């Protein structure tokens, strides 16, 4: 649990305190912020993610890693894009000549995602948006919404979630095919426990992507609620050819994942980790040289 989570879930657990804190944060939020060269539009009704971005404490290690590894010629698939932070970082990369596909089924977040995509200088047509949920099959799903944290919408009910919407879904392979994407060099998956479903529906894309960096949240509780298992998810990624690393929340430095079972055991309940999967000789050379320097 991070310091921010401790403050929000423990110190501000009483509803009157939380309501007051949320109101104060909302009043201070700007319409948009700069993260390096990127412009990110904020949801003014999201005190958690928008507040953390405004204060500069949101996913600092993950942002540092992304910025250090993303290349201007890469195709990036951003699954669970929210308001488009990582898509903006990609599009604003100096000399960008790749493509970005931002996938976000939450209709409210997508309003700000569209603004973010439009606000970052990139070649016409470089930034694409899909309103479908990436899953393992076509259909419709119920997305349960968190009113206080718009990045915590899930595909299963929970006491923290109030309100729901029906969203279209399809496999990641099909979504990418519709947008003319056959391979990706960088993929981010942050979908509150539905990560295994995404990967099951992406065998074609991941198989063809021989040089690939994959950033993924690893939350065994969420995976279980979506019908999967933490160890199964790790093995699934390894079977697809990814070498796994755990990403430091503070520094963004990846450390080899030596004991998957131990990781599962220490990420129970609300605890989670951020992982990086690396595939391909040139990608692995990059991380090895970084660790040696």
Regions found by a protein language model. Give the residues of each.
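Phosphate/nucleotide-binding beta-alpha loop and adjacent structural elements of enzyme active sites
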Residues: 1-293
């Amino acid at each position: 649990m991070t310091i921010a989570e401790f403050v929000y879930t423990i110190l501000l657990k009483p509803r009157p305190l939380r309501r007051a804190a949320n109101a104060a944060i909302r009043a201070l939020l700007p319409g948009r912020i700069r993260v390096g060269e990127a412009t990110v539009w904020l949801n003014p009704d999201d005190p958690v993610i928008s507040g953390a971005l405004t204060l500069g404490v949101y996913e600092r290690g993950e942002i540092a890693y992304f910025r250090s590894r993303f290349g201007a010629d890469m195709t990036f698939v951003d699954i669970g894009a929210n308001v488009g932070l990582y898509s903006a970082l990609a599009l604003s990369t100096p000399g960008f000549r790749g493509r970005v596909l931002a996938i976000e089924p939450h209709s409210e977040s997508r309003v700000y995602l569209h603004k973010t995509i439009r606000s970052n200088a990139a070649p016409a047509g470089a930034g694409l948006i899909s309103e479908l949920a990436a899953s393992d099959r076509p259909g419709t799903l119920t997305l349960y919404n968190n009113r206080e944290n718009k990045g915590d919408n899930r595909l299963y009910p929970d006491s923290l979630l109030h309100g729901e919407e029906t969203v279209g879904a399809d496999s990641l392979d099909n979504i990418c095919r519709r947008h003319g994407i056959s391979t990706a060099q960088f993929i981010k998956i942050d979908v509150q426990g539905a990560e295994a479903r995404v990967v099951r529906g992406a065998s074609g894309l991941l198989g063809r992507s021989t040089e690939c960096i994959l950033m993924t949240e690893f939350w065994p509780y969420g995976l279980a609620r979506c019908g999967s298992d933490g160890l199964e998810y790790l093995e699934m990624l390894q079977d697809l050819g990814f070498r796994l690393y755990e990403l430091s929340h503070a520094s963004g430095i990846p450390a080899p994942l030596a004991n998957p079972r131990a990781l599962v055991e220490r990420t129970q309940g609300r605890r989670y980790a951020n992982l990086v999967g690396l595939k391909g000789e040139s990608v692995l050379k990059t991380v090895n040289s970084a660790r040696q320097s």
